[in-house]
Amino acid sequence: MKLSEVQTCILSLFDAEKLERFPDEWAFRAAGDGDVSRVGYATNLTPETVEEAVRNEVGLMITHHDAWDFLYGMKEYCMGKLQEHGISHCFFHLPLDDADFGTSASLAKALGLRIVEKSNLYRDTFYCGRIGEFNAAVEFECLRGSLENLLGEPVRAWKSHDRPIKRVCVAAGGGLMTNDVKDAVDGTCDAYITGEKTLYTVEYARFAGINLFVGSHTFTEIFGVENLAAKVKDRFGDIDVMKLKEDHIE
């Protein structure tokens, strides 16, 4: 399948006006316009995921994050390796967080939540969180276990009340700011799930009386990238889609 056709398909999945207004939140870097037979996806663009793409002869990488400028030299290294091996790359940051098939929405649905509200507004445009409800309330340790099974990693959790958990705010990835937690509190949620925390996250959750669950940034967000890649597979059945291995290092 021609890369340009895959690019058109992917871009059509997002709000065009938001993409135009925030070009810093996404990119599609084409290495020519040859055929693409294999797509690899990961949360992060790192030397390790690029190496996985090279090893598996991937023609297009899809990630949630670009390589970070503040990890000095890493972005240049990744760009050089992609160019060297003729691998195209696209990333969608806030647009994927905002999408109904994106990071927080997909994690919420995977946990069995019925989404009832959007939350966690960023840049006055992108709703990066989702509030959902369980059909039947669950206990604290039950939710923690479900999240650990889903993410395949330990989940840190802080219990601030003894009520069963019915209503949950999910802000996958970097929802560590106290204003993110406040969105969950203002949304009358019993629990808040995210992928990063600081002292302030924990202290405010305790003060506000909301149960806090923290997985990793990488693996709370992978389900949205997986959904994006699956949509490419649905559109182009002949394309092979694979998950690129990422380590649990957080």
Where are the regions a protein language model picked out?
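Hydrophobic structural segments
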Residues: M1-E250
